[in-house]
Amino acid sequence: MLWQKPTAPEQAPAPARPYQGVRVKEPVKELLRRKRGHASSGAAPAPTAVVLPHQPLATYTTVGPSCLDMEGSVSAVTEEAALCAGWLSQPTPATLQPLAPWTPYTEYVPHEAVSCPYSADMYVQPVCPSYTVVGPSSVLTYASPPLITNVTTRSSATPAVGPPLEGPEHQAPLTYFPWPQPLSTLPTSTLQYQPPAPALPGPQFVQLPISIPEPVLQDMEDPRRAASSLTIDKLLLEEEDSDAYALNHTLSVEGF
């Protein structure tokens, strides 16, 4: 008895897929090989479709020169540049002609002809760490080596034709005295100041008695002064009047 395997149902044919080109393992090398083959045969290269992996539905065609042909184009450019450089003729060096001297203006007076008061030697005298005096020796308190020395003035090629200007007199040459000690080692001032006078002994304030008027006492003293000014007769009359009033008052009280 023979056992037969059940035959599987026939699978339906798969639907037709669009043409996706030829799959190659190394598409870049394949392109280079095909281009070299077309270049050697002399035929115009037809646009080829190369399918890269992981792109099953997209087709690409090479349009224009690729970046792989840049080496050949660069070498061709260098050869053309060398060829063009051979065509250009190098210019011959021209000889330089000396310029004629300019004619000076008749009314121009050079500034060297007028002596400037600041053309003398300038000196520097540090006064404090943040202040320094710069000026001629007449301004400073002592002479030191100059900072800027104007020894001579520039001589003009052509003398001035205009009338000379009246400038200040030239200063006499100054003599320089070297100052070996720096400012930090200068001795201190030799002036001696007198000590302040000692304080006076005893209290400096004098106590004066001050009398404060008392208005109550004055009111009490005023009747006494008025009584002393009255005569004895007037006093007797006033006392009699006061006694009679007191007597009448007592009588009226007793009678009541």
Curated annotation (Swiss-Prot):
State the function annotated in the UniProt record.
Answer: Transcriptional coactivator that specifically associates with either POU2F1/OCT1 or POU2F2/OCT2. It boosts the POU2F1/OCT1 mediated promoter activity and to a lesser extent, that of POU2F2/OCT2. It recognizes the POU domains of POU2F1/OCT1 and POU2F2/OCT2. It is essential for the response of B-cells to antigens and required for the formation of germinal centers. Regulates IL6 expression in B cells as POU2F2/OCT2 coactivator.
One GO MF term attached to the UniProt entry = transcription coactivator activity
Family note: Belongs to the POU2AF family.
In which tissues is this gene expressed? B-cell specific. Detected in mainly in spleen, but also in thymus, periphral blood leukocyte and small intestine.
Keyword Transcription, does the record have it? yes
- Spell out the InterPro entries in the cross-references: OCA, PD-C2-AF1
Describe the subunit structure.
Interacts with POU2F1/OCT1 and POU2F2/OCT2; the interaction increases POU2F1 and POU2F2 transactivation activity.
Provide one Gene Ontology cellular component. Answer: RNA polymerase II transcription regulator complex
Protein modification: Ubiquitinated; mediated by SIAH1 or SIAH2 and leading to its subsequent proteasomal degradation.
| Lineage top rank: taxon | Eukaryota
One biological-process term from Gene Ontology?
Answer: positive regulation of interleukin-6 production
* Record protein name field: POU domain class 2-associating factor 1
Encoding gene, per UniProt annotation: POU2AF1
The protein's UniProt keywords, in alphabetical order, are: Activator, Chromosomal rearrangement, Nucleus, Proto-oncogene, Transcription, Transcription regulation, Ubl conjugation
**UniProt-annotated location(s):** Nucleus
Mainly localized where? Answer: nucleus
